[in-house]
């Protein structure tokens, strides 16, 4: 599927009437599994990127080059649209332009730019936000950098949990007026907060890790929520599986005694072994 088609598929979700769950993806295998299972799109979160690329916690240590290369690998591996958490855009508004250019070229279907002050400021234990003016400048730069008009650019704010609901709405309205395609809110905890956001804005809404009170997807859809990101369990599950397997091997377990391993059939499927074999037969004269 061409980049334009993937981006069009993501836009169709935003303009639709349902609230969907994206798959948390982080590498070529995870995105292929998500694609095979029929997820509508994948979400490549910033915390997951830090884990997958560096093995570090989510403290803004990865570089744009590292992020874009991982997105490129995933985009090559499967046709599933990917929304990339581009964090703060890796610097000021000029850096944001470069971030959009690189992620668009890497095949991202969409990306989020947030207003969190990153990396963590000296002496500040709690998360901080950039000013409304700086946040808007980053969003404006992101929109200006876009070359494919189908690329989805989502303005993200963490103000609900850092400053106030009113501040979150004001920031969102500024991003909406600038021309973003959707609004991403983290820290929304109650139906009352969502009602206020939905009433004040007109764009499709994305929520980060909504709590149980916001677990009714029909209710979310009625409030224009089109995306509900529900954490990043796959990489945590994979980490646990690797830990258990290596622990068993270290303790002397025989290979045939190991449990929880992917079957040969599943490995062939996710590696697209049949496609590779067909190409080998066609181009190398290798009989299957």
From Swiss-Prot:
**Reactions listed under catalytic activity:** oxaloacetate + H(+) = pyruvate + CO2
Q: What is its EC number?
A: 4.1.1.112
Q: Does the keyword Magnesium apply?
A: yes
> Any idea which GO molecular function terms this record carries?
magnesium ion binding; methylisocitrate lyase activity; oxaloacetate decarboxylase activity
| Free-text comment on the cofactor | Binds 1 Mg(2+) ion per subunit.
Which cofactors are required for activity? Mg(2+)
Could you tell me the keywords of this UniProt record? Answer: Decarboxylase, Lyase, Magnesium, Metal-binding
A Pfam family (short name) is PEP_mutase
Instruction: Name the positions where Mg(2+) binds.
Output: 85
Q: Which InterPro entries match?
A: ICL/PEPM, Oxaloacetate_deCOase_bac, Pyrv/PenolPyrv_kinase-like_dom, Pyrv_kinase-like_dom_sf
Q: Which residues bind substrate?
A: 47, 156, 232
Q: Alphabetically, which GO biological process terms does the record hold?
A: oxaloacetate metabolic process; propionate catabolic process, 2-methylcitrate cycle; pyruvate biosynthetic process
The similarity comment for this entry is: Belongs to the isocitrate lyase/PEP mutase superfamily. Oxaloacetate decarboxylase family.
For this protein, the record's HAMAP family field holds: OadC
Quaternary assembly: Homotetramer; dimer of dimers.
Q: What role does it play?
A: Catalyzes the decarboxylation of oxaloacetate into pyruvate. Seems to play a role in maintaining cellular concentrations of bicarbonate and pyruvate.
Q: What is this protein called?
A: Oxaloacetate decarboxylase
Q: What is the lineage of its organism?
A: Bacteria, Pseudomonadati, Pseudomonadota, Alphaproteobacteria, Hyphomicrobiales
């Amino acid at each position: 599927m061409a980049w334009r088609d993937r981006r069009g598929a993501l836009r169709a979700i935003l303009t639709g009437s349902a609230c969907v769950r994206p798959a948390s993806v982080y590498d070529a295998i995870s995105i292929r599994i998500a694609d095979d299972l029929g997820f509508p799109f994948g979400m490549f979160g910033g915390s997951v990127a830090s884990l997958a690329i560096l093995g570090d916690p989510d403290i803004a240590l990865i570089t744009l080059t590292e992020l874009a290369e991982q997105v490129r690998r995933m985009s090559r591996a499967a046709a599933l649209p990917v929304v990339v958490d581009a964090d703060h855009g890796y610097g000021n508004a000029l850096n944001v332009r470069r971030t959009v250019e690189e992620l668009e070229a890497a095949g991202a279907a969409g990306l989020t730019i947030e207003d969190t002050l990153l990396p963590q400021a000296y002496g500040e234990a709690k998360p901080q936000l950039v000013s409304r003016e700086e946040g808007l400048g980053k969003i404006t730069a992101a929109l200006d950098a876009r070359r494919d008009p189908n690329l989805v650019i989502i303005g993200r704010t963490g103000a609900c949990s850092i400053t106030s609901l009113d501040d979150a709405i004001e920031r969102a309205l500024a991003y909406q007026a600038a021309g973003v395609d959707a609004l991403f809110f983290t820290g929304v905890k109650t139906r009352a907060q969502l009602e206020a956001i939905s009433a004040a804005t007109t764009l499709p809404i994305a929520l980060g890790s909504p709590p149980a009170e916001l677990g009714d997807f029909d209710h979310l859809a009625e409030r224009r929520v089109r995306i509900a990101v529900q954490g990043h369990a796959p990489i945590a599950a994979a980490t646990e599986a690797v830990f258990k397997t290596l622990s068993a091997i270290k303790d002397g377990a025989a290979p045939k005694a190991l449990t929880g391993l992917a079957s040969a059939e599943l490995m062939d499927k996710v590696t697209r072994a049949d496609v590779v074999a067909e190409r080998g037969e066609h181009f190398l004269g290798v009989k299957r």
